[in-house]
Amino acid sequence: MNLKIRIIGAGLAGCEAAWQCARRGLDVELYEMRPVKSTPAHQTSDFAELVCSNSLKSAGENSAPWLLKEEMRRGGSLLLEIAQKTSVPAGHALAVDRGAFAAEVTRVIEAEPRIRVVRGEVTKIDENDALTVIATGPLTSDALSQEIARLSGNTHLYFYDSISPIVEADSIDMSRVYMAARYDKGTADYINCPMNKEEYDRFLDALIEAHSVDAKEWENLNYFEGCLPIEEIARRGRDTLRFGPMKPVGLTDPKTGRYPYAVVQLRQENLRADSYNLVGFQNHLKYGDQARVMRLIPGLENAKFLRYGQIHRNTYINSPTLLTETLRMKEHPNVFFAGQISGVEGYVESIATGQMAGMHVSTVAMGHEPVAPPRATAFGSLVNYICHAEAKHFQPANITFDLLPQLDEAARRKVRDKKERHRMVCEAALKEFDGWLATSQIFQ
C-alpha cells in the first residue's frame, strides 16, 4: 500500500480532495503557493477563495446543478456543507459570503490533524514517488504548467475568463431600483435596476465604445461561452444583452406593473449585505471606462466600486487524451487531476471532481482499484464528458442535462412534460449513485 498522498493546490478541488482522504484515515500533504506567490486574480491567502461569482448555481430541486450537489451531499462533501453554512440570500441559487466561506474552509482544513499544509510553490512532480492529485486550478503557475506539460506530453489548452464588478451597498440609489426574484419564485433577494429603451440604448452605445484593457497576449481571445464579457456579448447584436444577462422577463417593475425593457440584477455578496455584485457583468474594460459605463445603470449613478471587472487566463489539460474516468492519468497512474484544470467549469463541478479524486486516490492508497461512478449519475456524466469528449475541440463544461443520459424512447413518448422528464432523470441518477457509493466506495 502507498499511503503517501500529495495534493497540489488548496482551492475548491484540492481542499475537498484532502478532506476526503483525511476522513478515510489517510495522511495528506496539501501544498498551496499563496501567499508566497500569488496569482492575478486572488486577493487573499485563504483556501478555496472564490475569485469570480459568489454563486454555486441553482438549488432548485431536479435541476442539473441540484442533482450534482445532491450527489456531493450524499457523498459527504465538506465544502458543500460549508457553503450551506455561509450562504447568503439568492433566490433559488446557492450563493455564499465568499470571505466567510474561504475563512471557514481554511480553518477546518488547517485544524485537521491528518492534513499537513505546506505553503510554497511546487515546481516539480515526481510521478513515481507518491500518489499525487493536481488541483492547481486555472491559474496554475508557469513553472508547474511546464511540469504538467512534461507529464502530459503536450501543451495546455486555455480560455479567457472574466470577473464581474462589486459595488458598495450604500452607494446604490434604492429609490430607482426594486427587490424581486424572477417570476416571484422564492424570496425577493435580488436588487433589480430597470431600464427603458432610451436608457438601454445609451448604456449599450457607451459599452461598445468603451476601451478594453490592453494586453498583447489577449489577441485572438478564446472565451468560455458561459462567461463571456458583456462587451463581447454586446458586439453580437443590439438585443443580445436583453436576451442574456439583462433579460427582463419575470421581473415585474412594481412602479409600472410591467417588465422593464432591460434589467441589471445585483446579488448580495456577503452576510453583512454591504456589497453587491453585478450578475453576469463580467468584463475587461479599463477601470475609468468601466466606472463611467456602469454608472449609466439606473441606481448606480454614484456607485462606489469595491472591485472592477477583469480578465484572466484559465488553463486546463486535454483530458480526453490523458485521463481515465477515475481522473487518473493513463500514462502515469500515480497522478490524478481535479478541479478546473481537469476540464470542468464552475465552482460546484470543481468541488465534485475534487471529491471524486479524493475518493479514488484513497482507494488506490489502500491497495484497491477505484471504480468510476455510473454514467447515469451527475458525477459519472461529468467525468464521461471530460474523458470522452472530442479531443481536438475539447472545451470545459458545466453540469447540464445535455451531459446526462436521456430517458429511453418509450419513456419520452409517454412523458412529454420537461420538468417531469428531468425529475425522472434525477431519480434514476440518485438511485445509481447510492448503489455505487454503497458498493465501490468501501473506505468511507
From Swiss-Prot:
Q: Is NADP a UniProt keyword of this protein?
A: yes
- Residue positions annotated to bind FAD are 9-14
Question: What is the first-listed, main subcellular location in coarse terms?
Answer: cytoplasm
Q: Per its UniProt record, what InterPro entries does this chain match? A: FAD/NAD-bd_sf, MnmG-rel, MnmG_N, TrmFO
Q: Its catalytic activity?
A: uridine(54) in tRNA + (6R)-5,10-methylene-5,6,7,8-tetrahydrofolate + NADH + H(+) = 5-methyluridine(54) in tRNA + (6S)-5,6,7,8-tetrahydrofolate + NAD(+); uridine(54) in tRNA + (6R)-5,10-methylene-5,6,7,8-tetrahydrofolate + NADPH + H(+) = 5-methyluridine(54) in tRNA + (6S)-5,6,7,8-tetrahydrofolate + NADP(+)
EC number(s) stated in the UniProt entry for this protein: 2.1.1.74
Q: What does this protein do?
A: Catalyzes the folate-dependent formation of 5-methyl-uridine at position 54 (M-5-U54) in all tRNAs.
How is this protein named in the record? Methylenetetrahydrofolate--tRNA-(uracil-5-)-methyltransferase TrmFO
